[in-house]
UniProtKB/Swiss-Prot annotation:
Active site, UniProt feature: 58
Protein name from the UniProt record: 3-hydroxyacyl-[acyl-carrier-protein] dehydratase FabZ
Places the protein is found: Cytoplasm
Alphabetical UniProt keywords: Cytoplasm, Lipid A biosynthesis, Lipid biosynthesis, Lipid metabolism, Lyase
Molecular function (Gene Ontology), one example: (3R)-hydroxyacyl-[acyl-carrier-protein] dehydratase activity
Record keyword Acyltransferase present: no
Length: 157
């Protein structure tokens, strides 16, 4: 699904992510992206640590990463690869639109390294749908389909 408005990039470190995503601590939920195949697929990496603020209340004696944050991390990975591939000088913003078929299979806890596999399964104009799978140590912990829209800074929603 490549076109003339895309550039070749195979990985993105935290600085590259900060350059394209509006999220910041504590809501930037990916640390790095690897295995980037254009705007079609990639793997986000989230190193889960006990220092994250949501563990204070979810749950104090048994810290578990909230499922909604796992889905958000998958969506950030999908959004980031869309934005990283753009060659246009106009900044874009990705708006999360839908979550479908979300399933949570096992808890994610501090110390886990969350791999967020995203693959574009559909695109129409500026709206893309991604199949997402989150894994820890090769075991599927969550999955969902997410849809998002890219909006260019000077366009109206």
């Amino acid at each position: 699904m490549s076109d003339d408005n895309q550039t070749k990039l195979e990985a993105a470190d935290i600085q590259a992510l900060l350059a394209v995503l509006p999220h910041r601590y504590p809501f930037l939920l990916i640390d790095r992206i690897v295995d980037i195949d254009g705007d079609v697929s990639a793997t986000g990496i989230k190193n889960v640590t006990i220092n994250e603020p949501h563990f204070t209340g979810h749950f104090p004696e048994n810290p578990i990463m909230p499922g909604v944050l796992i889905v958000e991390a998958m969506a950030q990975t999908a959004g980031a690869i869309s934005l990283l591939q753009r060659k246009t000088g106009r900044p874009g913003v990705v708006y999360f639109m839908t979550i479908d078929n979300a399933k949570f299979r096992r808890p994610v806890v501090p110390g886990d390294r969350l791999l967020l596999h995203v693959k574009k399964i559909k695109q129409r104009a500026n709206i893309s749908k991604y199949e997402c799978v989150a894994e820890v140590d090769g075991v599927k912990v969550a999955e969902a389909e997410v849809a998002a829209m890219i909006s260019v800074a000077d366009e109206n929603l």
